[in-house]
A protein has these predicted regions:
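Catalytic loop of the DD-peptidase/beta-lactamase superfamily, centered on the K-T-G motif
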Residues: 1-102
Length: 102
């Protein structure tokens, strides 16, 4: 912020890495985990996402969504306000990666 680092790189690494042990999650949720305040993609293919593994994300009730994909050097923020249309985020993600040739 204003040229000053607020968080150490090590802190960001902890916050954006899975903090939940595999045995603590039901089987169907083994493709993603949880960092500190974010979801973490552990197996993007299994999640049917274009994002790279270890990308992190979160979404809201009205289809707001952000994700950070370090593997592809990409940050996406969607601030739509549409209730009840969960599949639109998947379509938007595919379009973003297709447009970028990823």
């Amino acid at each position: 912020f204003n040229g000053k680092r607020i968080l150490n790189p090590e802190t960001v690494e902890i916050m954006t890495s899975n903090q939940v042990e595999k045995k603590a999650k039901p089987y169907k949720f083994d493709a993603f985990g949880f960092g500190v305040t974010v979801g973490v993609a552990l197996n993007s293919k299994k999640m049917r996402m274009k994002r790279g593994d270890n990308s992190y994300f979160w979404g809201g009730a009205a289809r707001t969504l952000f994700w950070v994909d370090p593997e592809n050097d990409l940050v996406f923020v969607n601030m739509s306000q549409v209730l009840g249309s969960p599949r639109i985020n998947n379509k938007v993600e595919k379009l973003v990666y297709k447009a970028l040739g990823i």
